Amino acid sequence: MGQYNFDQILDRTHTKSLKYDFAVKRGKPADVLPFWVADMDFEVPPELKQILLDRVNHGVFGYTESDDEYFEVLQNWFTTRFNWTPDRKWLVKTPGIVFALAMAVRAFTDEGEGVLINQPVYYPFSMVIDDNDRRLINVPLIKGEDKYTIDFEGIERAIVEENVTLFLLCNPHNPVGRVWTEDELKRLGDICIKHNVLIVSDEIHADFVWKGHTHKVFADLGESYAEHCIVCTAPSKTFNIAGLQVSNIFIPNDSLRRRFIKEIDRAGYSQLNTMGIVGCEGAYKVGAPWLDELKEYIQDNIQFTIDYVANYMPKIHVYRPEGTYLMWLDCSKLPLSPKERDEWIINEAKLWLDTGSMFGVDGEDFERINVACPRKTLEEGLEAWRRAYEARGF
């Protein structure tokens, strides 16, 4: 047994948890077991918890700003983990990556212009496009038997035909779990550079890349790629601190960075909250041993889920993720429409998953499940699904 106890089950109800306390308000039964939103059912590293407690005990929460140590800790993390050393001047802090995506859409496109994405993909990608009155240009990923691939020809064709100037990339990819290879990223980058398309790379899941795969920061592909990209990072998924509202955006191109900052200024945003700054710096400073153990635990959960579904629900096909703690389940062989399937899972299995249609029409046959939880919780959920599966005679 390691230093940290990931088997501990924490009662998250009555904490204003989006995951646990808002089922009824979101139209779900009160007794569903949630595996939907991408936060983890693990306590933060105890060393980080102590840092946060010490700051709270100080008792004063006035205006706060990051200092040299904040960036040095951040830089050290990326150098150690990804062999990428960002420059301090590239950093722009925001309260979240979705906010940063919206700011990029507003800063670098005009109303009515096309923004390209690859569905199925994290649903706020489409939201920030639609909400800002841009045209959503979708070039779907190519679904293979065991993994998805990028439709490079389709992307280049869409860029030319739809006059696309901005591309939102998800790497590691949520929900299909791909970790795009360096060759794939360079090919994508070459297309975008050729047609002067800015790439905004959401790399929030970069710390959860599984054995046999390597995350390549887009800005680390080479100078020309760095000049055509914005890299979005955050400690929120890595250390389960999404509620602290802090993200670190890296923009190597001076002109692009000035335009991005101007858009943030126009939105009236100025500073991160106190606990976000303390939590981010603290997490990257002390959280590495905890994360290394956690990754082993989650990888075991992933394998357990693959084996369990194959053995007991064989009409459901699991895509093994190369990264993220989210698993993409193909339910197309079930004799149910997407709506019927969702109602069956919610009302009979009593599970709250993210239905695949949230990620675009290309995800209609799928469900997404979050396996970043204690094994007992995962077993309880899968066993409930199995009982509902067997009761239907599938």
Model-derived regions: residue spans:
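Short clusters of hydrophobic/aromatic residues that line enzyme substrate/ligand-binding pockets
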Residues: 9, 61-63, 150, 218
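Short regulatory "switch" loops immediately downstream of catalytic or recognition motifs
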Residues: 16-23, 140-143
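Conserved N-terminal alpha-helix of the aminotransferase class I/II PLP-enzyme fold
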Residues: 55, 62-95
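Short acidic, glycine/Ser/Thr-rich loop/turn "cap" segments at secondary-structure junctions
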Residues: 57-60, 104
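PLP-dependent class I/II
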Residues: 4, 27-33, 38-53, 85-87, ...
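Conserved PLP-binding active-site segment in aminotransferase class I/II-type PLP enzymes
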Residues: 1-19, 28-31
